[in-house]
Amino acid sequence: MPVENEFPRELPNHSLISSKSQMTLQSIWLFRYPVSSIVCVQFPTDFPKPVLALSARIAIDLGLFTHIVQKCPITSRSLAAITGAEELLITRILRLLSTAHFAEETSTGTWAPTPITKTMAKEEIAAGYRFICHMVVPALQSAPGYFQHHGYSCPTDAKDGLVQHALQTKKTSFEYIMSDPHLLKDFNLFMGNGMGARKSWLDWYPVQSNILDGADADPDKALIVDVGGGKGHDLIAFHKRYPNAGRLVLEDLPAAFDDLGQYSMVIEKVPHDFLAEAQPVKGAKAYLCHHILHDWPDNYCVRILEGISSAMTPGYSKLLLHEGIVPEKGVCQFQAMSDIATMACNGGMERTREQWRTLLHMAGLQLIRFWNSPDEGGDGIIEAAKV
Protein backbone atom coordinates (compact mmCIF):
# COMPACT_ATOMS: atom_id res chain seq x y z
CA MET A 1 0.00 0.00 0.00
CA PRO A 2 1.58 3.33 -1.00
CA VAL A 3 2.43 5.65 1.85
CA GLU A 4 1.09 9.19 1.54
CA ASN A 5 3.60 11.56 -0.07
CA GLU A 6 5.74 8.69 -1.41
CA PHE A 7 4.76 9.74 -4.95
CA PRO A 8 3.05 6.47 -6.05
CA ARG A 9 2.06 8.07 -9.38
CA GLU A 10 5.71 8.33 -10.41
CA LEU A 11 7.85 5.93 -8.40
CA PRO A 12 7.75 2.19 -9.16
CA ASN A 13 7.57 -0.23 -6.24
CA HIS A 14 10.07 -3.01 -5.61
CA SER A 15 8.00 -5.66 -7.38
CA LEU A 16 7.95 -3.56 -10.54
CA ILE A 17 11.64 -2.76 -10.20
CA SER A 18 12.54 -6.42 -9.84
CA SER A 19 10.67 -7.31 -13.03
CA LYS A 20 12.67 -4.88 -15.13
CA SER A 21 16.22 -5.05 -16.33
CA GLN A 22 18.72 -2.54 -15.03
CA MET A 23 18.74 -0.91 -18.45
CA THR A 24 15.01 -0.28 -18.16
CA LEU A 25 15.65 1.34 -14.80
CA GLN A 26 18.15 3.60 -16.47
CA SER A 27 15.42 4.82 -18.80
CA ILE A 28 12.89 5.22 -15.99
CA TRP A 29 15.12 7.05 -13.56
CA LEU A 30 17.51 8.96 -15.75
CA PHE A 31 15.06 10.25 -18.33
CA ARG A 32 11.59 10.06 -16.87
CA TYR A 33 12.22 10.95 -13.27
CA PRO A 34 14.81 13.75 -13.20
CA VAL A 35 13.24 15.62 -16.12
CA SER A 36 9.75 15.22 -14.68
CA SER A 37 11.03 16.55 -11.38
CA ILE A 38 11.65 19.88 -13.08
CA VAL A 39 8.96 19.96 -15.76
CA CYS A 40 5.92 18.45 -14.08
CA VAL A 41 5.58 20.31 -10.79
CA GLN A 42 1.79 20.50 -10.85
CA PHE A 43 0.57 19.76 -7.34
CA PRO A 44 1.81 20.49 -3.81
CA THR A 45 2.70 16.79 -3.35
CA ASP A 46 5.16 17.16 -6.26
CA PHE A 47 7.20 19.74 -4.37
CA PRO A 48 9.87 17.29 -3.05
CA LYS A 49 10.78 15.97 -6.50
CA PRO A 50 13.42 18.59 -7.37
CA VAL A 51 14.89 18.05 -3.90
CA LEU A 52 15.09 14.32 -4.59
CA ALA A 53 16.87 14.88 -7.91
CA LEU A 54 19.30 17.29 -6.22
CA SER A 55 19.98 14.78 -3.46
CA ALA A 56 20.71 12.09 -6.05
CA ARG A 57 23.22 14.40 -7.72
CA ILE A 58 25.01 15.05 -4.41
CA ALA A 59 25.06 11.32 -3.71
CA ILE A 60 26.65 10.75 -7.11
CA ASP A 61 29.29 13.42 -6.48
CA LEU A 62 30.17 11.71 -3.19
CA GLY A 63 30.12 8.24 -4.73
CA LEU A 64 27.55 7.08 -2.17
CA PHE A 65 25.77 4.66 -4.49
CA THR A 66 29.04 2.96 -5.44
CA HIS A 67 30.15 2.64 -1.82
CA ILE A 68 26.77 1.24 -0.74
CA VAL A 69 26.92 -1.38 -3.50
CA GLN A 70 30.53 -2.35 -2.82
CA LYS A 71 30.50 -2.32 1.00
CA CYS A 72 26.93 -3.18 1.94
CA PRO A 73 25.66 -2.85 4.51
CA ILE A 74 27.43 0.39 5.35
CA THR A 75 26.74 3.09 7.93
CA SER A 76 26.58 6.83 7.46
CA ARG A 77 29.61 7.08 9.74
CA SER A 78 31.64 4.80 7.46
CA LEU A 79 30.49 6.71 4.39
CA ALA A 80 31.57 9.95 6.04
CA ALA A 81 35.00 8.50 6.78
CA ILE A 82 35.40 7.34 3.18
CA THR A 83 34.11 10.47 1.45
CA GLY A 84 35.14 13.21 3.87
CA ALA A 85 31.57 14.51 3.99
CA GLU A 86 29.73 15.25 7.22
CA GLU A 87 27.93 12.21 8.66
CA LEU A 88 24.77 14.23 9.34
CA LEU A 89 24.62 15.47 5.74
CA ILE A 90 25.01 11.93 4.40
CA THR A 91 22.23 10.67 6.67
CA ARG A 92 19.86 13.43 5.60
CA ILE A 93 20.53 12.85 1.90
CA LEU A 94 20.17 9.06 2.10
CA ARG A 95 17.11 9.33 4.31
CA LEU A 96 15.30 11.15 1.52
CA LEU A 97 16.67 8.92 -1.23
CA SER A 98 15.57 5.80 0.64
CA THR A 99 11.94 6.96 0.46
CA ALA A 100 12.23 6.59 -3.32
CA HIS A 101 14.11 3.26 -3.13
CA PHE A 102 17.45 4.75 -4.21
CA ALA A 103 18.82 2.90 -1.16
CA GLU A 104 17.40 0.86 1.71
CA GLU A 105 17.81 1.80 5.35
CA THR A 106 18.20 -1.60 7.04
CA SER A 107 18.66 -0.12 10.51
CA THR A 108 19.21 3.38 11.86
CA GLY A 109 21.92 5.01 9.75
CA THR A 110 22.78 1.78 7.93
CA TRP A 111 22.31 1.41 4.18
CA ALA A 112 22.00 -1.44 1.70
CA PRO A 113 21.58 -1.38 -2.09
CA THR A 114 18.36 -1.77 -4.06
CA PRO A 115 18.19 -2.41 -7.82
CA ILE A 116 18.08 1.37 -8.27
CA THR A 117 21.23 1.81 -6.16
CA LYS A 118 23.07 -0.62 -8.43
CA THR A 119 21.91 1.26 -11.51
CA MET A 120 22.87 4.62 -10.04
CA ALA A 121 26.34 3.27 -9.28
CA LYS A 122 27.01 2.77 -12.99
CA GLU A 123 29.33 5.42 -14.38
CA GLU A 124 27.21 6.06 -17.48
CA ILE A 125 24.21 6.81 -15.27
CA ALA A 126 26.28 9.08 -13.03
CA ALA A 127 27.51 10.83 -16.18
CA GLY A 128 23.93 11.33 -17.31
CA TYR A 129 22.93 12.90 -14.01
CA ARG A 130 25.90 15.24 -14.11
CA PHE A 131 25.10 16.20 -17.70
CA ILE A 132 21.43 16.82 -16.95
CA CYS A 133 22.25 18.93 -13.90
CA HIS A 134 24.90 20.90 -15.81
CA MET A 135 22.83 21.71 -18.91
CA VAL A 136 19.21 20.56 -18.88
CA VAL A 137 18.23 21.72 -15.41
CA PRO A 138 19.65 25.27 -15.78
CA ALA A 139 18.01 25.54 -19.21
CA LEU A 140 14.61 24.54 -17.86
CA GLN A 141 15.01 26.83 -14.87
CA SER A 142 15.71 29.71 -17.23
CA ALA A 143 12.61 29.00 -19.34
CA PRO A 144 10.26 31.61 -17.79
CA GLY A 145 12.73 34.44 -18.38
CA TYR A 146 13.68 33.17 -21.83
CA PHE A 147 10.10 32.92 -23.10
CA GLN A 148 9.13 36.27 -21.62
CA HIS A 149 12.07 37.86 -23.44
CA HIS A 150 11.32 36.03 -26.72
CA GLY A 151 7.58 36.61 -26.89
CA TYR A 152 6.63 33.08 -25.82
CA SER A 153 7.77 31.44 -29.05
CA CYS A 154 9.69 28.21 -29.58
CA PRO A 155 13.44 28.73 -30.11
CA THR A 156 14.53 28.54 -33.75
CA ASP A 157 18.19 29.53 -33.37
CA ALA A 158 20.45 26.89 -31.83
CA LYS A 159 22.78 29.69 -30.71
CA ASP A 160 20.02 31.64 -28.96
CA GLY A 161 17.99 29.15 -26.96
CA LEU A 162 17.35 28.18 -23.38
CA VAL A 163 20.83 26.78 -22.77
CA GLN A 164 22.39 29.94 -24.15
CA HIS A 165 20.10 32.09 -22.00
CA ALA A 166 20.95 30.07 -18.87
CA LEU A 167 24.70 29.67 -19.41
CA GLN A 168 25.30 33.04 -21.10
CA THR A 169 26.91 31.61 -24.22
CA LYS A 170 26.44 32.04 -27.96
CA LYS A 171 27.67 28.55 -28.74
CA THR A 172 25.27 25.81 -29.74
CA SER A 173 24.79 23.24 -27.02
CA PHE A 174 27.07 20.84 -28.87
CA GLU A 175 29.78 23.47 -29.32
CA TYR A 176 29.49 24.21 -25.61
CA ILE A 177 29.83 20.52 -24.76
CA MET A 178 32.87 20.16 -27.02
CA SER A 179 34.55 23.10 -25.27
CA ASP A 180 34.46 21.41 -21.85
CA PRO A 181 36.43 18.12 -21.65
CA HIS A 182 34.65 16.93 -18.50
CA LEU A 183 31.21 17.70 -19.90
CA LEU A 184 32.15 16.05 -23.20
CA LYS A 185 33.24 12.91 -21.38
CA ASP A 186 29.96 12.77 -19.44
CA PHE A 187 27.95 13.42 -22.60
CA ASN A 188 29.69 10.62 -24.52
CA LEU A 189 29.21 8.17 -21.65
CA PHE A 190 25.56 9.18 -21.34
CA MET A 191 24.82 8.95 -25.07
CA GLY A 192 26.68 5.66 -25.30
CA ASN A 193 24.29 4.08 -22.86
CA GLY A 194 22.31 2.38 -25.63
CA MET A 195 18.64 1.54 -25.97
CA GLY A 196 18.05 0.06 -22.53
CA ALA A 197 15.41 -2.67 -22.62
CA ARG A 198 13.85 -1.33 -25.81
CA LYS A 199 14.17 -3.33 -28.98
CA SER A 200 16.80 -2.30 -31.50
CA TRP A 201 15.56 -1.04 -34.86
CA LEU A 202 17.31 -4.09 -36.32
CA ASP A 203 14.66 -6.23 -34.59
CA TRP A 204 11.69 -4.71 -36.39
CA TYR A 205 12.86 -2.85 -39.50
CA PRO A 206 13.04 -5.10 -42.64
CA VAL A 207 16.81 -4.91 -43.12
CA GLN A 208 17.02 -7.79 -45.57
CA SER A 209 14.43 -6.54 -48.05
CA ASN A 210 15.00 -2.81 -47.65
CA ILE A 211 18.79 -2.58 -47.33
CA LEU A 212 20.57 -5.81 -48.22
CA ASP A 213 18.51 -6.91 -51.21
CA GLY A 214 19.59 -5.04 -54.31
CA ALA A 215 22.64 -3.48 -52.66
CA ASP A 216 25.59 -2.75 -54.95
CA ALA A 217 28.15 -5.56 -54.69
CA ASP A 218 31.04 -3.16 -55.32
CA PRO A 219 33.12 -3.27 -52.08
CA ASP A 220 34.01 0.41 -52.54
CA LYS A 221 30.34 1.39 -52.37
CA ALA A 222 29.04 2.09 -48.87
CA LEU A 223 26.12 0.02 -47.65
CA ILE A 224 25.26 2.17 -44.61
CA VAL A 225 26.49 5.60 -43.59
CA ASP A 226 25.73 6.38 -39.95
CA VAL A 227 25.57 10.19 -39.89
CA GLY A 228 26.51 11.61 -36.49
CA GLY A 229 26.85 8.06 -35.19
CA GLY A 230 29.15 8.81 -32.25
CA LYS A 231 30.74 5.66 -30.89
CA GLY A 232 29.25 3.47 -33.60
CA HIS A 233 26.76 1.46 -31.55
CA ASP A 234 24.32 1.05 -34.43
CA LEU A 235 26.94 -0.08 -36.91
CA ILE A 236 28.52 -2.46 -34.41
CA ALA A 237 25.11 -4.03 -33.78
CA PHE A 238 24.49 -4.20 -37.53
CA HIS A 239 27.84 -5.89 -38.17
CA LYS A 240 27.18 -8.48 -35.48
CA ARG A 241 23.98 -9.51 -37.26
CA TYR A 242 25.20 -9.11 -40.83
CA PRO A 243 28.98 -9.60 -40.67
CA ASN A 244 29.55 -9.77 -44.43
CA ALA A 245 26.93 -7.31 -45.59
CA GLY A 246 29.11 -4.54 -46.99
CA ARG A 247 31.02 -1.34 -46.28
CA LEU A 248 29.95 0.46 -43.11
CA VAL A 249 30.85 4.13 -42.59
CA LEU A 250 30.69 5.99 -39.28
CA GLU A 251 30.59 9.79 -39.47
CA ASP A 252 30.88 12.35 -36.69
CA LEU A 253 33.06 15.14 -35.38
CA PRO A 254 36.52 13.85 -34.40
CA ALA A 255 35.91 14.61 -30.71
CA ALA A 256 32.90 12.28 -30.70
CA PHE A 257 34.78 9.27 -32.03
CA ASP A 258 35.97 6.49 -29.78
CA ASP A 259 38.22 3.49 -30.31
CA LEU A 260 36.16 0.87 -32.14
CA GLY A 261 38.44 -1.90 -30.92
CA GLN A 262 37.91 -5.13 -32.82
CA TYR A 263 35.44 -3.38 -35.13
CA SER A 264 37.95 -0.82 -36.41
CA MET A 265 38.75 -3.13 -39.33
CA VAL A 266 35.13 -3.37 -40.47
CA ILE A 267 33.77 0.09 -39.66
CA GLU A 268 35.34 3.05 -41.43
CA LYS A 269 35.49 6.35 -39.52
CA VAL A 270 35.03 9.53 -41.56
CA PRO A 271 35.26 12.92 -39.79
CA HIS A 272 32.25 14.96 -40.85
CA ASP A 273 30.38 18.08 -39.71
CA PHE A 274 26.86 17.56 -41.04
CA LEU A 275 25.94 21.22 -40.52
CA ALA A 276 28.91 22.70 -42.36
CA GLU A 277 29.99 20.13 -44.95
CA ALA A 278 28.46 18.30 -47.87
CA GLN A 279 28.01 14.56 -47.38
CA PRO A 280 31.36 13.04 -48.44
CA VAL A 281 30.18 9.46 -49.03
CA LYS A 282 28.20 9.30 -52.25
CA GLY A 283 25.63 6.76 -53.35
CA ALA A 284 25.27 4.63 -50.21
CA LYS A 285 22.34 2.25 -49.96
CA ALA A 286 21.22 3.75 -46.65
CA TYR A 287 21.99 6.92 -44.72
CA LEU A 288 21.08 6.50 -41.05
CA CYS A 289 20.43 9.39 -38.65
CA HIS A 290 19.75 8.12 -35.14
CA HIS A 291 18.44 10.80 -32.77
CA ILE A 292 20.05 13.59 -34.77
CA LEU A 293 17.20 15.75 -36.03
CA HIS A 294 15.27 15.89 -32.76
CA ASP A 295 18.18 17.94 -31.40
CA TRP A 296 17.76 20.74 -33.95
CA PRO A 297 15.20 23.37 -35.03
CA ASP A 298 13.59 22.93 -38.46
CA ASN A 299 15.91 25.26 -40.36
CA TYR A 300 18.97 23.36 -39.14
CA CYS A 301 17.31 20.03 -39.96
CA VAL A 302 16.67 21.15 -43.52
CA ARG A 303 20.37 22.01 -43.86
CA ILE A 304 21.34 18.56 -42.55
CA LEU A 305 18.87 16.78 -44.81
CA GLU A 306 19.91 18.73 -47.89
CA GLY A 307 23.53 17.78 -47.25
CA ILE A 308 22.61 14.10 -47.13
CA SER A 309 20.28 14.36 -50.10
CA SER A 310 23.09 15.74 -52.25
CA ALA A 311 24.90 12.40 -51.93
CA MET A 312 21.91 10.10 -52.42
CA THR A 313 21.26 8.20 -55.63
CA PRO A 314 17.60 8.50 -56.76
CA GLY A 315 15.88 5.13 -56.95
CA TYR A 316 18.60 3.43 -54.89
CA SER A 317 19.57 5.32 -51.73
CA LYS A 318 17.35 5.42 -48.65
CA LEU A 319 17.30 7.85 -45.75
CA LEU A 320 16.46 6.25 -42.41
CA LEU A 321 15.62 8.68 -39.61
CA HIS A 322 15.51 6.79 -36.31
CA GLU A 323 13.48 9.25 -34.27
CA GLY A 324 10.46 9.65 -32.07
CA ILE A 325 7.14 9.81 -33.91
CA VAL A 326 4.75 11.72 -31.68
CA PRO A 327 1.03 10.97 -32.07
CA GLU A 328 -1.18 13.92 -32.96
CA LYS A 329 -3.29 13.17 -29.88
CA GLY A 330 -2.67 11.20 -26.73
CA VAL A 331 1.12 11.50 -26.48
CA CYS A 332 2.77 9.46 -23.74
CA GLN A 333 4.48 11.29 -20.89
CA PHE A 334 7.98 10.20 -21.91
CA GLN A 335 7.64 11.63 -25.43
CA ALA A 336 6.11 14.88 -24.16
CA MET A 337 8.92 15.36 -21.63
CA SER A 338 11.54 14.47 -24.23
CA ASP A 339 10.05 17.15 -26.48
CA ILE A 340 10.47 19.81 -23.80
CA ALA A 341 13.96 18.56 -22.93
CA THR A 342 15.15 18.68 -26.55
CA MET A 343 13.71 22.18 -26.90
CA ALA A 344 15.58 23.24 -23.78
CA CYS A 345 18.85 21.63 -24.82
CA ASN A 346 19.28 22.89 -28.37
CA GLY A 347 15.99 24.24 -29.71
CA GLY A 348 15.07 20.75 -30.89
CA MET A 349 11.71 19.01 -31.13
CA GLU A 350 10.04 15.61 -31.03
CA ARG A 351 7.91 15.64 -34.18
CA THR A 352 4.55 14.28 -35.28
CA ARG A 353 4.01 12.48 -38.58
CA GLU A 354 2.76 15.67 -40.19
CA GLN A 355 5.80 17.59 -38.96
CA TRP A 356 8.10 14.90 -40.38
CA ARG A 357 6.29 15.06 -43.73
CA THR A 358 6.66 18.83 -43.82
CA LEU A 359 10.34 18.70 -42.88
CA LEU A 360 11.17 16.15 -45.58
CA HIS A 361 9.24 18.17 -48.16
CA MET A 362 11.17 21.32 -47.21
CA ALA A 363 14.41 19.42 -47.91
CA GLY A 364 13.19 18.06 -51.25
CA LEU A 365 12.86 14.49 -50.00
CA GLN A 366 9.98 12.07 -50.46
CA LEU A 367 8.46 10.23 -47.52
CA ILE A 368 8.28 6.50 -48.19
CA ARG A 369 6.89 5.08 -44.96
CA PHE A 370 6.70 5.36 -41.20
CA TRP A 371 7.90 2.23 -39.39
CA ASN A 372 6.71 1.98 -35.79
CA SER A 373 8.63 0.35 -32.97
CA PRO A 374 6.76 -2.38 -31.06
CA ASP A 375 7.73 -0.66 -27.79
CA GLU A 376 5.13 1.65 -26.31
CA GLY A 377 6.37 5.19 -26.79
CA GLY A 378 9.38 3.86 -28.64
CA ASP A 379 11.12 5.50 -31.56
CA GLY A 380 10.28 4.66 -35.14
CA ILE A 381 11.95 4.84 -38.52
CA ILE A 382 11.00 7.55 -40.99
CA GLU A 383 12.05 6.19 -44.38
CA ALA A 384 12.59 8.66 -47.21
CA ALA A 385 14.13 8.85 -50.67
CA LYS A 386 15.49 11.47 -53.01
CA VAL A 387 12.90 12.75 -55.45
Curated annotation (Swiss-Prot):
Residues annotated as coiled-coil are none
Output the superkingdom of the source species. Answer: Eukaryota
Note whether S-adenosyl-L-methionine occurs among the keywords: yes
List of catalytic residues: H294
Specify the pathway.
Secondary metabolite biosynthesis; Alkaloid biosynthesis; Mycotoxin biosynthesis
The protein's matches in InterPro entries, at most eight in alphabetical order, are given as: COMT-like, O_MeTrfase_dom, SAM-dependent_MTases_sf, WH-like_DNA-bd_sf, WH_DNA-bd_sf
Q: Tell me which EC number(s) this protein carries.
A: 2.1.1.-
Q: Which UniProt keywords apply?
A: Methyltransferase, S-adenosyl-L-methionine, Transferase
One Gene Ontology MF term? O-methyltransferase activity
- Please list the residues that bind S-adenosyl-L-methionine: D252
Q: Cite a single GO BP annotation.
A: methylation
The cross-references to SUPFAM superfamilies, in alphabetical order and at most eight, read: S-adenosyl-L-methionine-dependent methyltransferases (SSF53335), Winged helix' DNA-binding domain (SSF46785)
What role is this protein assigned?
O-methyltransferase; part of the gene cluster that mediates the biosynthesis of the aspoquinolone mycotoxins. The role of asqD within the aspoquinolone pathway has still to be determined. The first step of the pathway is catalyzed by the nonribosomal peptide synthetase asqK that condenses anthranilic acid and O-methyl-L-tyrosine to produce 4'-methoxycyclopeptin. 4'-methoxycyclopeptin is then converted to 4'-methoxydehydrocyclopeptin by the ketoglutarate-dependent dioxygenase asqJ. AsqJ also converts its first product 4'-methoxydehydrocyclopeptin to 4'-methoxycyclopenin.
Q: Which family does it belong to?
A: Belongs to the class I-like SAM-binding methyltransferase superfamily. Cation-independent O-methyltransferase family.
Protein name in UniProt: O-methyltransferase asqD
- This chain's source organism reads Emericella nidulans (strain FGSC A4 / ATCC 38163 / CBS 112.46 / NRRL 194 / M139)
Gene, per the UniProt record = asqD
